[in-house]
Amino acid sequence: MAVPALWPWGVYLLMSLLSLGSCLDTLEVCPSLDIRSEVTELRRLENCSVVEGHLQILLMFAATGEDFRGLSFPRLTQVTDYLLLFRVYGLESLRDLFPNLAVIRGARLFLGYALIIFEMPHLRDIGLPSLGAVLRGAVRVEKNQELCHLSTIDWGLLQPAPGANHIVGNKLGEECADVCPGVLGAAGEPCVRTTFGGHTDYRCWTSSHCQRVCPCPRGLACTVGGECCHSECLGGCSQPEDPRACVACRHLYFQGVCLPTCPPGTYQYESWRCVTAELCGHLREVPGHATAFGIYEGSCLAQCPPGFTRNGSSIFCHKCEGLCPKECKVGTKTIDSVQATQDLVGCTHVEGSLILNLRQGYNLEPELQRNLGLVETITGFLKIKHSFALVTLGFFKNLKLIRGDSMVDGNYTLYVLDNQNLQQLGSWVAAGLTIPVGKIYFAFNPRLCLEHIYQLEEVTGTRGRQSKAEINPRTNGDRAACQTRTLRFVFNLTEEDRILLRWERYEPLEARDLLSFIVYYKESPFQNATEHVGPDACGTQSWNLLDVELPLSRTQEPGVTLAPLKPWTQYAVFVRAITLTTAEDSPHQGAQSPIVYLRTLPAAPTVPQDVISTSNSSSHLLVRWKPPVQRNGNITYYLVLWQRLAEDGDLYINDYCHRGLRLPTSSHDTRFDREDPALEAEPEQGCCPCQHSPPGQALPALEAQEVTFQKKFENFLHHAITIPKAPWKVTSINKNPQRDSERHRRETGLLRLGKNNSDFEIHEDKVPRERAVLSGLRHFTEYRIDIHACNHAAHTVGCSAATFVFARTMPHREADGIPGKVVWKAVGKSSVILHWLEPPDPNGLILKYEIKYRRLGEEATVLCVSRLRYAKVGGVHLALLPPGNYSAKVRATSLAGNGSWTDGVAFYITGPEEEDTGGLRILLTVTPVGFMLLVMLAALGFFYSKKRNSTLYTSVNPEYFSASHMYVPDEWEVPREQIAIIRELGQGSFGMVYEGLARGLEAGEESTPVALKTVNELASARERVEFLKEASVMKAFKCHHVVRLLGVVSQGQPTLVIMELMTRGDLKSHLRSLRPEAENNPGLPQPALSDMIQMAGEIADGMAYLAAKKFVHRDLAARNCMVSQDFTVKIGDFGMTRDVYETDYYRKGGKGLLPVRWMAPESLKDGIFTTHSDVWSFGVVLWEIVTLAEQPYQGLSNEQVLKFVMDGGVLEEQEDCPIQLQELMRRCWQHTPRLRPTFVHILDRIQDELRPSFRLCSFYYSPECQRGQASLLPTEAEPDSPPTLNGASDYGPPNGDPGH
């Protein structure tokens, strides 16, 4: 077998491997990644060679194809668990994204699947040319309406058992142009043919990338040249028979080598690599968790197997003698479910405290005993509260000691509160439980007899430590209802997912006797709830409860917010006061409200379920679905939208005369023949649904697996997606359907399927039931149909998100007929051209034509003509025909099949004696006429150009707007056609600021993300020139810590200034987003001291550079520092900060806006701005970093700040401010300017604490700084002069002078 035939894609793969460098030497391991919402999140994969865990890429609804252009992660070679892709819009192939992904190991699977590609609306091919192995698990590719090249993949080459794969609901193979390289005249050598699923075909991932088929024995991998790799290699290699040159390892990886077993002194970890004992000892299953890994039988494990434990400081697992002692460090652990006890299995010594809060469940004791039954010692306290599911505490059958190292409220070692069904303390009395310190507390345990508590006092040795009130006889063991006072609700407010309540203040005789309130609530479709708070008839807890602390003010009414609740659901609620009676002779006191019923507000429903469709004619589609799982109101109608989809134009590329043509169909969905779901009775509320299957009859295994997967996947979606309210309101649907359809398409992103789909109108209808008939459709055309559920509150909450289905109408039997007659024209001696018109409205696309022609007295010949061949001449050229009389007829073949034959046309071929001289006569006539026309056009063009160039530009004030004010394009000029605008970033003082892409701006980069500053359309020529001159100041700056100017577009409108894009915005916004209570918190921790010093160093470095360039900033503040994607802080802005933070400025004496809270005293007094005054501002920026961007001098007005600073005041010290930063601030705020340090001196003090990367890119470590370091003099600006650094901000100077 020839190597070139095996490897037509070898050059591509070779380049990919070269881009990896030494495959295993540079391994970078990343943990599991969940990448969603934004395409930029994919950058987290940038340095990953292996994803140790799973990789999920999902829910990118706003993405477009352009967002993925140039995005590639060639370093990624393997994923150890599974790869999941779900609803990523705009992504057409994984070919460029993961060109070298070679192995999916499947160590942990997603419900049995290692590769899941689900509902990817724009994916056209999988395109993983390097993928060579899916070691474990099946493949699920489902509901991807544009996905092709599935029939050309031999999954048997990738998987040991491909029979479990689930590949359904994708684009029909008959509609796909699944042509492999080298087939039907395609470029390259043909791919290898294999047999899979009984079908022999060429194997490829795309039309330009073959599937890898190695000519090696025993399934070995191979190089791009077909040479066999080492037996330990998997997925390919760069050198044959070299275990160091593998793309991935078949068994184990260690220090760049693939090995069958781990070397001595190393241990297997995560089934694919070897680690040292030292590294294993540092691993944690949960980062930051105390429990360390252990080594057992050559493997590094998260915990030792049963019967084994770690002894002391040893990392190795040893067999226990008898019962394994197991120490578990838990801190203070709350157990609110059986699952929460699973990490205590086998624990005998609990170092910490346990809080049991088991409110729901039935017959939990066996499972709790299995998980907690070995516990002998608790070093802290044991608190059992609100555990309505507990009847006994016997599951602590071995508990012998509660040591009391920490106690509840500093007093109680055992605390048992409000356990409505607790009856027994188990074997504690018999086992001799000891409580050496602290008290015990029992209250509100109505079924727990007092004698059990008194016995426990004796055994534990706590008798006499606690008062009678701490074991209250009236709240323990008292089944009878106590005499209580009625509480009255005074306020309630309902929302979609919450209820706000307030009730009257209850005051017992002794105010200190009132401890708290408990609010009980539950769903109650009928107003028949009782106050019983134990398990219901089904054994589950009926009431939810919430502790409410007493208000601090005695006049304030207590209240609570119940959340999260279900929309449009009736809840029963009552409140009970928890009291403690200290006086022995005092009557029992208590208070409780009656049960009230409240209904939450409606919300948008969830999506309709199980939508199906079929076609019963060429112009109709039938659609049916089931109601949403959560209606969140009364469903009043369904909004149905449908749009015609464009046919795949790529089908024209193939020559269907040479390729077997399998045509798409519009088969009837048999599910329509089943019973109408509308006729099935819904279960009555409050009753259990009946089982349709006979008792004991289970679903078939395959169907059960399918149901399980669908339920689990839908649960995953339910928890993973928060569907926002629809941005449109249903009440406006009938006002202007066309406008509303456009709005749907623009705002909700619906129906963005093909390149030309926007040319087709979106239709809509409202239907009252779960079915719709769509009429007036085009024959044999695919439609996307979206269904939204709308309830009675749709006018305020909107309808649900859409569920969608794709369906094709049936063909029209006459649509593929060729209109008119076939005509012919003789060309040459033995050739004719047959012309005919295409069917004006065919069934889908016309793929080919068939011409049946015959010479009189001979057999007919059938000629196939592809659509491309027809398009060249509008017919077919029949050549080399012998003389004689002929007849011919034509028929078209569309996606729906063959059309009807045309009527025959007769033509003849003349003999050799007849020659056509007409062509020469025509040529002699046309040539002179054409020459005269060319001369006339040239003359017109000359006069028009001369007139255009004579236009004069005048100035009303030529003395003021002189030549010196004109902007002259230079080497910074960028052609406008290289710029693409993506989205708005904000409004600057000159005009709008956009995010964009610039092509060819940087060497080696196809496109560069940039920020584009513009001038308003109504700006004068002077304003445009001033805008460009301000930007020109930045041309002199080239420092890593100053935002760079990248180019200028001065020719044409609008004028653009191209700046470096700082994706995380200004430092002030970034710091505020890191506050714990911030709504836009990105999930990042608050900055540590090292992070703060790094920010300070980067700002100081940028300011040192400006000082060396003799520039004074005059407005240094966090709002004027920008943060890049990698969190680097730079000096500069996008001209937006004054608009966003205008309150940070103050107008003094009718002049311009001044940033008084950041200004030095000499600047406030005399208007003097120097590098020393910038240092003062730097100190304020440090204060902003420490406080996460609080406003300086909070509580003082701008006038008060002016007086305070000029009188010698400085910002107050923060309690939690690091001493190092506080000292730096004090030095920056010296009132004598020359006593303040320079920026270089500041860097001298903190250089040792900056990250190593700072040395590589900073001005401070550059030769330019070292030369000028000793001679840096403060740069001064005269009072009220224009700002020296015009380019640093896009608004006017602080003193209000326009600068000219």
Swiss-Prot record:
Region annotation (Disordered) ranges: 1270-1300
Amino acids binding ATP: 985-993, 1013
Top EC class of this enzyme: transferase
Pfam families xrefs: fn3 (PF00041), Furin-like (PF00757), PK_Tyr_Ser-Thr (PF07714), Recep_L_domain (PF01030)
UniProt xrefs under Gene3D superfamilies: Hormone Receptor, Insulin-like Growth Factor Receptor 1, Chain A, domain 2, Immunoglobulins, Phosphorylase Kinase, domain 1, Receptor L-domain, Transferase(Phosphotransferase) domain 1
Disulfide feature: 214-222, 216-228, 229-237, 233-246, 249-258, 262-274, 280-300, 304-317, 320-324, 657-864
Record topology, Cytoplasmic segments: 943-1300
CDD domains: FN3, FU, PTKc_InsR_like
Residues the record marks as carrying a glycan: 47, 311, 411, 492, 528, 616, 634, 756, 885, 898
Segments on the Extracellular face: 747-921
InterPro entries, sorted: FN3_dom (IPR003961), FN3_sf (IPR036116), Furin-like_Cys-rich_dom (IPR006211), Furin_repeat (IPR006212), Growth_fac_rcpt_cys_sf (IPR009030), Ig-like_fold (IPR013783), Kinase-like_dom_sf (IPR011009), Prot_kinase_dom (IPR000719)
Reactions listed under catalytic activity: L-tyrosyl-[protein] + ATP = O-phospho-L-tyrosyl-[protein] + ADP + H(+)
Location(s), subcellular: Membrane
Membrane association type: Single-pass type I membrane protein
EC id: 2.7.10.1
Segments traversing the membrane: 922-942
Every Protein kinase domain range: 979-1254
Catalytic residues in the record: 1115 (proton acceptor)
Post-translational modification: Autophosphorylated on tyrosine residues between pH 7.9 and pH 10.5.
Similarity remark: Belongs to the protein kinase superfamily. Tyr protein kinase family. Insulin receptor subfamily.
Domain notes: The extracellular domain is required for sensing alterations in external pH.
Function of the molecule: Receptor with tyrosine-protein kinase activity. Functions as a pH sensing receptor which is activated by increased extracellular pH. Activates an intracellular signaling pathway that involves IRS1 and AKT1/PKB.
Complexes and interactors: Probable tetramer of 2 alpha and 2 beta chains linked by disulfide bonds. The alpha chains contribute to the formation of the ligand-binding domain, while the beta chains carry the kinase domain.
Protein name: Insulin receptor-related protein
Gene from which this protein is expressed: Insrr
